Regions:
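Non-catalytic substrate-recognition and accessory regions of acyl/acetyltransferase enzymes
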Residues: 1-113, 120, 124-142, 146, ...
Length: 182
């Protein structure tokens, strides 16, 4: 199946249309993904905190969405020198800017959901980050996820490495070098 990606920024002057698109989205597996999309993505877009992209299938259904942002990271001493170097380029540099895939959500209300894999969605998001890297540089991509076995296995299968262990209710952090993706 073919997919087209569009920015919600292209529809900001028609919030009624966006609200109609939002109504077609359901992610029962993670209500936070659905909540961000429906309640925060427009505001984050307007404030330039992030960019949200819609993935539309050839039947003009919303297949999923992803949100990209930049994040300032402080790599504490618990992060290995190898991972610190992957993120910042230097094993002794504690601060770094990193690309963030802040949201990644499939639309389970789409009748063709089984034909659209999470791997396809993350690959589309990574393609956009690669374009940004060509323009402004950058070394790595960060994702954060809940401590759920399926999520952890998904990101590890995609080549991400766990950056730090979870403490309390904090999200798990995974990174991948952009060099590894080329």
């Amino acid at each position: 199946m073919r997919y087209m990606t569009v920015s919600i920024r292209d529809y900001l002057d028609d919030e009624n249309l966006l609200c109609g698109i939002f109504e077609t989205f359901s992610c029962s597996k993670n209500k936070d993904i659905e909540g961000f999309f429906k309640e925060k993505s427009i505001d984050f877009e307007k404030k330039h905190f992030s960019r949200t992209y819609l993935v539309i299938d050839e039947h003009r259904n919303l297949a999923g969405y992803f949100t990209l942002a930049l994040k300032a990271m402080n790599l504490d001493k618990s992060v290995s020198n190898r991972l610190r170097k992957l993120v910042s380029g230097y094993s002794n540099k504690p601060d770094s800017a990193i690309y963030l895939i802040g949201q990644l959500g499939k639309n389970y209300a789409n009748p063709y959901v089984k034909q659209f894999s999470g791997d396809s969605l993350i690959n589309i998001a990574v393609d956009y980050i690669n374009e940004a890297q060509d323009i402004v540089g950058g070394r790595a991509i960060l994702v954060e996820c809940e401590n759920r076995k399926l999520l952890m296995e998904f990101y590890e299968r995609c080549g991400f490495q766990q950056l730090s262990k979870q403490t309390g209710d904090a999200l798990l952090t995974y990174v991948i070098s952009l060099d590894k993706l080329h």
